[in-house]
Curated annotation (Swiss-Prot):
It comes from the Archaea. NCBIfam families: PRK04334.1-1. Belongs to the UPF0280 family. This is UPF0280 protein Mevan_0550. Gene3D superfamilies: ApbE-like domains.
Length: 247
């Protein structure tokens, strides 16, 4: 099945969206604008929410995006902004599902939310690691049809804050918001030699609830914990967000 693609950029939010119906682009863009406004208004009144590296206590009347970010950060013991990209992706996909989308992928800086009635292959982009571009994950339609998250944190690629040095920490979870915060938390433990760093990451992953599995790469080394999708070989070398196939 062929999907329609469009890049949507609104201030710091830059997403690659793939949908089965081009009419959904307008809905997605409105959702991003609305949620950005909600987040910006909240931060203007609660500036610590933007800068803290620790979970932030919120009130019951906080906007949905703030609640998702706060809950995900508490689950992983990181600051709420660690979940911002995955949360935007998740909210977009849920909005599209409510508007009869059958297959949609929203990628925001390596943090992906998706839903599909087809299997989807997501390629692994891990910076300079020799593993990068050679492996992909086959996500089964039964697992992703109502929404799913695949989020990656890196200490060597991108502008997001990470206190570790892993080339990639990919987390799989029902919620992209949960996966995003978890990936940041786990990636912070990637210190020491490659094998030490990977083991520390996997130990931290076992302390985090609500995630299905984790795949970590550090140079030519890799490790996993929990249940991850089937690994397959791929020859794709594009950036993480461009490596999607419907099968």
């Amino acid at each position: 099945m062929e999907l329609f693609s469009e890049k949507i950029s609104i201030k710091e939010t830059n997403v690659l969206l793939k949908v089965d119906n081009p009419k959904l682009f307008k809905i997605a863009k409105k959702k991003i604008i609305d949620e950005r406004l909600n987040l910006e208004k909240y931060i203007s009144k609660n500036p610590v929410f933007l800068t803290t590296y620790s979970p932030f206590k919120i009130s019951n009347d906080a906007p949905e995006i703030v609640k998702l970010m706060a809950n995900s950060s508490e689950n992983a013991n990181v600051g709420p902004m660690a979940a911002v990209a995955g949360t935007f992706s998740e909210l977009v996909i849920h909005s599209l599902l409510e508007n009869n989308s059958k297959s949609a992928i929203c990628e925001n800086g390596g943090d992906i939310a998706l839903s599909s009635d087809f299997d989807i292959i997501v390629g692994l982009y891990a910076g300079n690691s020799p593993i990068s571009g050679n492996l992909g994950f086959k996500l089964k339609k039964e697992k992703i049809k109502n929404g799913y998250g695949v989020c990656t944190s890196s200490g060597t690629v991108g502008h997001s804050v990470s206190f570790g040095n892993a080339d990639s920490v990919t987390v799989f979870a029902k919620s992209a918001s949960i996966a995003d915060a978890a990936a940041t938390s786990i990636g912070n433990f990637a210190v020491g030699s490659p094998d030490e760093a990977i083991n520390k990451c996997l130990e931290q992953a076992e302390n985090i609830l609500k995630i299905d599995g984790v795949f970590v790469t550090f140079q030519e080394y890799a490790g996993k914990v929990g249940k991850i999708p089937t690994l397959i070989r791929t020859e794709k070398k594009e950036a993480f967000g461009n490596v999607f196939e419907m099968v």
